[in-house]
């Protein structure tokens, strides 16, 4: 059957309900994290962070915020990477679902440098949060265009070093392959439905370029990556050098 992916879908996902809770949600969060690991999603976001901090002094603390953090798997990956490479990361997970935040906290008890906040990204509390780097992994597609512009405007204003976005390519091939993954990983009904809707709410490269131009972003890079992802890195031009100097002064 022909699948039209010309335009983004407006269909909502079950997980868009921030009051959702229970074992079904917990299972979905953990399966999403596992699939993201196996398909290289965590590695893709980590590579983006590595690119952004390449010229930063490694002796200083870097605050990284993960928007739509899910079960916190990405932040634990970052924390492990930081420990292995003698980097000081302070990681903050953001999610609007309190059950999700509690689950992430339980899974991150052994990480003293990871904290979580149940916050609406369109609230004043989030708009006042400052950080060096902000991550948005498999989260941006949940928003409409005007919300995306508003959200990235906040990201750009409040981040000192840059932004790493990792999200889905909208394509019929990705849709069909995910149907196969549903069978292989025995995903529950919610995960199957939401996963397929997520792909239809994903992006074409020209749409991300359009957002970049509309936001008047000076330095950005958009690359297609396996498995049917786009890595969108926004660097704060001029700010990297000032951050480096401030860090050196602190030392």
Which residue ranges define each predicted feature?
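N-terminal, positively charged/glycine-rich alpha-helical extensions of SAM-dependent methyltransferases
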Residues: 1-30
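Class I SAM-dependent methyltransferase Rossmann-like catalytic core
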Residues: 22-48, 52-53
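Class I SAM-dependent methyltransferase SAM/SAH-binding core
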Residues: 65, 71-73, 78-123
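A conserved beta-strand element that flanks and buttresses the S-adenosyl-L-methionine
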Residues: 135
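A short, conserved alpha-helix within the catalytic core of class I
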Residues: 143-154
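Conserved beta-strand signature within the Rossmann-like core of class I S-adenosyl-L-methionine
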Residues: 160-168
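C-terminal alpha-helical "lid/dimerization" subdomain adjacent to the S-adenosyl-L-methionine
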Residues: 168-212
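Conserved Class I S-adenosyl-L-methionine
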Residues: 205-235, 247, 251
